[in-house]
Every structure is written in structure tokens, then in C-alpha cells.
């Protein structure tokens, strides 16, 4: 249910309540029994003859009837306690909200501020050099490419004392002589399994216990192109994947409302939904509603791409009500702060925007640090030039100042800042192709190579990283994108927009991109950014968001099936059995969109009796292939031995239980052909006596067979 704690709020009630025939359940991991990991259980009909099906759940508390949703107060901040338990962080006052944070909007157009305020957390600095608790000196290096790791990633760091421990008044979380750990990558490299790692391992297993025989069979049936999908996900496997940089848990320490999830090629393929206002349309109310709506249908993360007024306020409302990771493109807001003129952008303005969003709790930033001055001319002969908003902003800045991008030259500082809050990098593809004519050109791949260099720097700084990819790519050029990304970026998770496989279908680009998304997900892409029917045409509304999410859930699931993910096919098989058994309600409920499935069925067969009918409106009652198959099975089960023998002979197959002698005669002495003719004549007569009807009730057939036996 929804309530409003403040009667003056303009926020509408968001969509709550379970999906059809579903309920929220919670798995309790053995490693941390205090954790409650959410799953959605699809309740099957009484006649199903099989257990209910648990599936991955992204909906947060919004589908839990036991939780009262109050968007004005926000969700419970359960994860904040986990962060504080680990130590190595401090609570502080944070920066004040400035007028430019909301685009200097006037009072008449200002959105209502979020009512609750939470002091932000940040990672503690290392003890000063020369003190008893000072860390070893960092490796020398300057600018991009010069950073080194304090401790090699292969060297285990000391285990932290309980509750983060303290020595001589200095907080630490990785031993008294090293700087405090903050990020999931740092903990993973230290051999420490966090609660977030335990949580996501349980989610990935979809509530199943170890079923190794079936899991290994599924893996053997798939083609993973070199991925290392496990038969069963353990917290240790999660830790090892994060330590290697092959997976990330985007989880800002200030996003206490978050239900952790993992992004990596060896886990379930995830999808992202984009929302956000613009200078000409949408509002805070609509964007919060779209976020809740997107996760209801399966979005694993949401990016707030707001570019209009009230950006800070919109983001605060979204974050405080978001159980999933929230990403942003900070350059959008920075541009609003300088009146939309890219030439006026400065490093100081951008850095202040990063701090603002880190304190709010944004989980990952798209940063277009790979758009270098030397690459811009490579786009001159493109059909569609630079289509990334962030890429075009930085390209214009570079040309106007004829300098290297400040995102590139200050990358070390960006890493240091993001590490303090465990904000993950989503290294942006500012030079991605905007048409299939530009796919895989030198500009695109030059930027990708630079992103690989930046990935290593971010890793050395302790930051989690994923890489953004295209874009518009025809089918035959998709795999090279995946292969090159894995090679250049050290297997960091890949996150792509589609790709769109053709440019001829405005209004249907959720389909043109869904095709490419399924393929690149199969090849190893870890997260797919959805495309809606409004792509290239306008800002998506609520219905467009749903269509985009469902389309990409299909693509992600198809890629998981192809990779041989151990649990992926459980839902397919359950729905197939329901379809064959004519359990219509189970068919609807096992689908990704039960409401639409039932609505389509009911357009032509609206009566309740049709929900149990053994046919649909496509074939009708007399031509349903599955009904015919069921009749054949029932018929065969009731045949006597003589009838089976006759049918076998007529079809040229073996006689089964009725033996045949070497002389070519049946055991009762009759010639085989005579026996067959007699049996066929008997069945012909039976057909006439039963009314010469092609389709018969199965029970009547069984009764008739008893008389013949």
C-alpha cells in the first residue's frame, strides 16, 4: 500500500502489490543468516503437479504486501549498517545544495525537496606518512598511465578486526599499517567476503540449492565463448570474479536503500532502463513513477539521464526510493550549471558535481574519459558523426580549448574521489557509432583502446569498472566488438546500448536493438541498456519503459539460455509444460508480462471456461496440435497388444511387446501382413461406430478400448 507522510507532497502513489499469482519470498544464506535475499515465487495452479517457481526479483519492497510504501520517507536504509560495521568510513556534514544544482530554477518551477536528510559517508584517508599507522609509500606515477597499486592485486591484505576495529584513535578496515578499504574491489582483493557478495551469490542461484547434475548438463548444452559460468554461485566465486575485475557490485556506500546485485559475464545477464526529464518534458513525479515501473518489469539498474530543471531534486527522490543501483552521466548536470555551454565547463565545476552525486548515493558514473583530442578528427567522415551527448560535449570542449579532455588529464583524481564512496566507473563510449555505416571504425576502436588503459588505472586505484559499448552494429560485426573489448579491457564487464542491427525501423528500435542485444549478451556482454520504441523520436513514457524492459528481458534471458546458465531454462520448461497441459492461467503467470498475455488471449476467448479449454483461438478446438498429441498419447496408452501390433506393422516399426518369429509370422501363427490388415480393419470399424469424428473425448476413447481388449 501507499501512504503520504506529508499532505503537501505532489508525488503520486507508485505502483505497488505483487505481480499476478506471485508472492515475495526470501532466501537466507548459510554464510549470513541475518540477510533476507528477495525472490519472486510464481504460484502455479493446483493441478500443475509441480512446485511453485522462484525467479529473480528486482522489484524491491514495492511488491511486498507487508511493507507500507511511503515515497516521502523513502525506503529502509538497511545496507548502511553493513557499511558502518566494516569501518574505514566517516559520517560528515556534506556540501550544501546550491541553486545551480537544480539549474537555478525559480520558485514557481522548483520541485518539492525530499523531506529526509541523511549525512553522507565517505572513506577515510590513509594515516599521514610517518605516523605509527602510516601505509607503505605508493608507487610513483603522474597523470594518466602513471598510477600504481599500493599493494599488488595478487597479494592478500590483512583481515580487518571485528566491526572495523581501531588502534591509537585511527579507524581502519584492512590492518593498522594500510589505508582503510572502502570498495568491493579492495575487499575482494584482500580475500574478504562482504555481505554484499553473499547477498548477490544467493540472488544469482534463484533460490535453488546445489543441483549439480542438472546444472552441469545445462552448461554442457550451452556455448559460452570462453566464459566461466559456474554450476552453482558461491560467495567465494563472487569475490574472486570481483577481485579479477570481471564483475562489479555497483553499490555506493551512501545508497543504503540498495539491494545489491552483480554485473559480470559469468552471472545472469542484466538490463538497464534509462529515465530522466528534459528541458521540455517530464517531472519529478513522472520519473520516480517510471523508476518503480521499470523495476517492476525487471530492470536491474536504472540510469537517471535528466537534463532539465530540478536535476538534483529529481535524483534525490529517485535514490531514496530505489532498491536497485542508480547510474548517471555527471557531465549532463555540469553542463546545466554553466548555462548549457560546453566551452564554459571546468574541471572544478565537474569535480564539484561528482562530489554532489557521490554524497547523494549514485552507484555508477558514465564518464567519457576516452574522448581524446587526437581522436575527434577520426569522426569527420562518418555518416552520423558523434552521437553520444557526453562525447559531443567533450569533443566541443577539446576543440574550443585545443586541449586534452579534463576527464582524461584528471582521471587519477576522479578515481581517488570515486573510491571514497565506492562509486563504480561506467567508462563511456563517447565515440560509439550512431549508424551501422560507422560501426567498428577507427574512432570507435581507438577510444576502446584508451578505455582499456583507463580501466587498469582505475583498478590500481581500487575502483570497480565496467565498459560501455555501441550502438549501431550489423549482425556480422557484433562479435568483434565483444572480442576486442575483452582483450583491451582485461575482461571488465561490457555494457552496451543494444546494439541496433539496422537503421530502417524508427518506432521499432526496441526490436532492431533487441536482436543485437541477445547476440552480444550471448557472446559475453554483462549488461544490456534497453532501447524503447521512442528511441531517436522522443522521451519514453510509462508504457514505452515497460515495452523496452520486457524486450530486453527477453534478450537477456535468451543470451543466458545460449550460454547454458544452469537455472535459465527452468522457467521455459515450466511454461512449456503449462502450455502442453492447457493450464492457461499458469502460462500467463509464468510469462514476463502476465497482464498482456492474458489480455491477448481474452480478446477472442474472454469467458472463464476458455481458461481451461484445450485450445486457443488460433487453431480452434479441432486443429490444436497439442490437443491432438494429447489425444494420441491417451489413445496409445489404452490400446491392447493386438492393436499396438497392427499399428506397428502398418507403420513399419518394431512390434514392441508382441514378438515376431524368424519365419515372419506372429507368435500366434498368423502371417504378419494378414494380422496387420485385420487390425486396421478393426480400427476402421471402430472409427465408424464412434461417429466418424476426427477429435474425440479422451475418456470415451479409453472406454471403447476397454471393450476391445
Curated annotation (Swiss-Prot):
Pathway: Cofactor biosynthesis; thiamine diphosphate biosynthesis. Pfam families: ThiC-associated, ThiC_Rad_SAM. Substrate binds at residues 274, 303, 332, 368, 388-390, 429-432, 468, 495. It catalyses: 5-amino-1-(5-phospho-beta-D-ribosyl)imidazole + S-adenosyl-L-methionine = 4-amino-2-methyl-5-(phosphooxymethyl)pyrimidine + CO + 5'-deoxyadenosine + formate + L-methionine + 3 H(+). Keywords: 4Fe-4S, Iron, Iron-sulfur, Lyase, Metal-binding, S-adenosyl-L-methionine, Thiamine biosynthesis, Zinc. Binds 1 [4Fe-4S] cluster per subunit. The cluster is coordinated with 3 cysteines and an exchangeable S-adenosyl-L-methionine. Belongs to the ThiC family. Catalyzes the synthesis of the hydroxymethylpyrimidine phosphate (HMP-P) moiety of thiamine from aminoimidazole ribotide (AIR) in a radical S-adenosyl-L-methionine (SAM)-dependent reaction. This is Phosphomethylpyrimidine synthase. It comes from Rhodopseudomonas palustris (strain BisB18).
